[in-house]
């Protein structure tokens, strides 16, 4: 029996208050309006950015359905939708691609102006929500809200992918893998034979290492205070691993000493101000590039001596690995299907969706790289 055009009642993980567990609730998901798509979720990853929203490090209006790294199947479409149809396998895009704004038309940038990241409204483009719980509207999260059996997204925020793709793996292309991999190959533009340092060895950090390796880096130094993460870092391409706690001097001085004055490319994949500076200082003062990948705490500032850049360093950042989402996600899935990279090393835990709080406990304890929730 078709559900198209009807309200769907389903389970979703609702965050009612900051720093509280998710509550599995029955929610009502309204049909998609014009240029919107309703998706039946199949798998969603738990990303550190979701936890940043739980703690308030990323500001979000409450109550909210979080989740942004996922894959599913189109259940129904609103009027005027042309890029997907019911039954298509898709990945929602937290960085949309409208194709019309100044940024979408820019050859190098991808941060579409129609995003809900900077000052989130928690609504779809028409300013309203498709979620209701206990008679109250529930906010969307960066246009995706994948911690729900069904979600509604704007057409500019969804990409059709290969019908044969395993959704419980390629969901990582919706955020973590692409963010890390693209930071190396597209944002930093790592060169063959170069030296790299990667701060933070979670799922995104490991994806940065995979990107550095794919780009031909000859030396990849992995940095983390959790040495349990070192074997996996080496498995995906790190040539050496160092723990800042093993040294009396600052880690940037250690890296400068072992890399002839600094690496060619450094990446901060944690989201801490002290490591952002350490990563910047770890790249060579005259020719190094440092990329901010991790999401830093909202409304915190940094004091940096401009002389650090005057000598020739480059300091940059990007959302979603610099990839134009609607164009790039299908290609990344095709590359995965062609075995150009593996996502298996990133997936450490698979849990049923109802165990979402357990999945977040694994993330916070450092015991998982990526936990996938299946519906």
Curated annotation (Swiss-Prot):
<dbReference type="Pfam" id="PF08240">
    <property type="entry name" value="ADH_N"/>
</dbReference>
<feature type="binding site">
    <location>
        <position position="112"/>
    </location>
    <ligand>
        <name>Zn(2+) 2</name>
    </ligand>
</feature>
<feature type="modified residue" description="N6-succinyllysine">
    <location>
        <position position="340"/>
    </location>
</feature>
<protein>
    <recommendedName>
        <fullName>Alcohol dehydrogenase 1</fullName>
        <ecNumber>1.1.1.1</ecNumber>
    </recommendedName>
</protein>
<feature type="binding site">
    <location>
        <position position="98"/>
    </location>
    <ligand>
        <name>Zn(2+) 2</name>
    </ligand>
</feature>
<feature type="binding site">
    <location>
        <position position="175"/>
    </location>
    <ligand>
        <name>Zn(2+) 1</name>
    </ligand>
</feature>
<keyword id="KW-0520">NAD</keyword>
<keyword id="KW-0862">Zinc</keyword>
<dbReference type="GO" id="GO:0042572">
    <property type="term" value="P:retinol metabolic process"/>
</dbReference>
<feature type="binding site">
    <location>
        <position position="370"/>
    </location>
    <ligand>
        <name>NAD(+)</name>
    </ligand>
</feature>
<dbReference type="Pfam" id="PF00107">
    <property type="entry name" value="ADH_zinc_N"/>
</dbReference>
<dbReference type="InterPro" id="IPR036291">
    <property type="entry name" value="NAD(P)-bd_dom_sf"/>
</dbReference>
<feature type="binding site">
    <location>
        <begin position="200"/>
        <end position="205"/>
    </location>
    <ligand>
        <name>NAD(+)</name>
    </ligand>
</feature>
<feature type="binding site">
    <location>
        <position position="229"/>
    </location>
    <ligand>
        <name>NAD(+)</name>
    </ligand>
</feature>
<dbReference type="InterPro" id="IPR020843">
    <property type="entry name" value="PKS_ER"/>
</dbReference>
<dbReference type="InterPro" id="IPR011032">
    <property type="entry name" value="GroES-like_sf"/>
</dbReference>
<feature type="binding site">
    <location>
        <position position="68"/>
    </location>
    <ligand>
        <name>Zn(2+) 1</name>
    </ligand>
</feature>
<dbReference type="GO" id="GO:0005829">
    <property type="term" value="C:cytosol"/>
</dbReference>
<dbReference type="GO" id="GO:0004745">
    <property type="term" value="F:all-trans-retinol dehydrogenase (NAD+) activity"/>
</dbReference>
<feature type="modified residue" description="N-acetylserine">
    <location>
        <position position="2"/>
    </location>
</feature>
<dbReference type="InterPro" id="IPR013149">
    <property type="entry name" value="ADH-like_C"/>
</dbReference>
<feature type="binding site">
    <location>
        <position position="104"/>
    </location>
    <ligand>
        <name>Zn(2+) 2</name>
    </ligand>
</feature>
<feature type="binding site">
    <location>
        <begin position="293"/>
        <end position="295"/>
    </location>
    <ligand>
        <name>NAD(+)</name>
    </ligand>
</feature>
<feature type="modified residue" description="N6-succinyllysine">
    <location>
        <position position="234"/>
    </location>
</feature>
<keyword id="KW-0963">Cytoplasm</keyword>
<feature type="binding site">
    <location>
        <position position="224"/>
    </location>
    <ligand>
        <name>NAD(+)</name>
    </ligand>
</feature>
<dbReference type="InterPro" id="IPR013154">
    <property type="entry name" value="ADH-like_N"/>
</dbReference>
<dbReference type="GO" id="GO:0008270">
    <property type="term" value="F:zinc ion binding"/>
</dbReference>
<feature type="binding site">
    <location>
        <position position="47"/>
    </location>
    <ligand>
        <name>Zn(2+) 1</name>
    </ligand>
</feature>
<keyword id="KW-0479">Metal-binding</keyword>
<comment type="subunit">
    <text>Homodimer.</text>
</comment>
<comment type="similarity">
    <text>Belongs to the zinc-containing alcohol dehydrogenase family.</text>
</comment>
<keyword id="KW-0560">Oxidoreductase</keyword>
<dbReference type="GO" id="GO:0042573">
    <property type="term" value="P:retinoic acid metabolic process"/>
</dbReference>
<keyword id="KW-0007">Acetylation</keyword>
<feature type="binding site">
    <location>
        <position position="101"/>
    </location>
    <ligand>
        <name>Zn(2+) 2</name>
    </ligand>
</feature>
<dbReference type="InterPro" id="IPR002328">
    <property type="entry name" value="ADH_Zn_CS"/>
</dbReference>
């Amino acid at each position: 029996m078709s559900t198209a055009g009807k309200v769907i009642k389903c389970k979703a993980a609702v965050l009612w208050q900051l720093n509280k567990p998710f509550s599995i609730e029955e929610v009502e998901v309204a049909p998609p309006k014009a240029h919107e798509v309703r998706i039946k979720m199949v798998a969603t990853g738990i990303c550190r950015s979701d936890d940043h929203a739980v703690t308030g490090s990323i500001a979000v209006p409450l109550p909210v359905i979080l989740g942004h790294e996922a894959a599913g199947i189109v259940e129904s479409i609103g009027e005027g939708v042309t890029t997907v149809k019911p039954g298509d396998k898709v990945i929602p895009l937290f960085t949309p691609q409208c194709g019309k704004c100044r940024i979408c038309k820019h050859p190098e940038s991808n941060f579409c102006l129609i995003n809900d990241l900077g000052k989130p409204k928690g609504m779809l483009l028409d300013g309203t929500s498709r979620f209701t719980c206990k008679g109250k509207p529930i906010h969307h999260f960066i246009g995706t809200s994948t911690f729900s059996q069904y979600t509604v997204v704007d057409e500019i925020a969804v990409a059709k992918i290969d019908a044969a793709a395993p959704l419980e793996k390629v969901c990582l292309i919706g955020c973590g893998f692409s963010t890390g991999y693209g930071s190396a190959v597209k944002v930093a533009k790592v060169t063959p034979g170069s030296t790299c340092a990667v701060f933070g060895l979670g799922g995104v950090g490991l994806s940065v290492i995979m990107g550095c390796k794919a780009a031909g880096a000859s030396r990849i130094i992995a940095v983390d205070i959790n040495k349990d993460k070192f074997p996996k870092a080496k498995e995906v391409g790190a040539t050496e691993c160092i723990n800042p706690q093993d040294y009396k001097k600052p880690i940037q001085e250690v890296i400068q000493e072992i890399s002839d004055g600094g690496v060619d490319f450094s990446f901060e994949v944690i989201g801490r101000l002290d490591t952002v500076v350490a990563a910047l200082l770890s790249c060579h003062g005259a020719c190094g590039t440092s990329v901010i990948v991790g999401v830093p705490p909202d409304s915190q500032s940094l004091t940096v001596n401009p002389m650090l850049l005057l000598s020739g360093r480059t300091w940059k950042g990007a959302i979603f690995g610099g990839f134009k989402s609607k164009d790039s996600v299908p290609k990344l899935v095709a590359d995965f299907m062609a075995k150009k990279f593996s996502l298996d090393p990133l997936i450490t835990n698979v849990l049923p969706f109802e165990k979402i709080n357990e999945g977040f406990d694994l993330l916070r304890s450092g015991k998982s790289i990526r936990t996938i929730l299946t519906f």
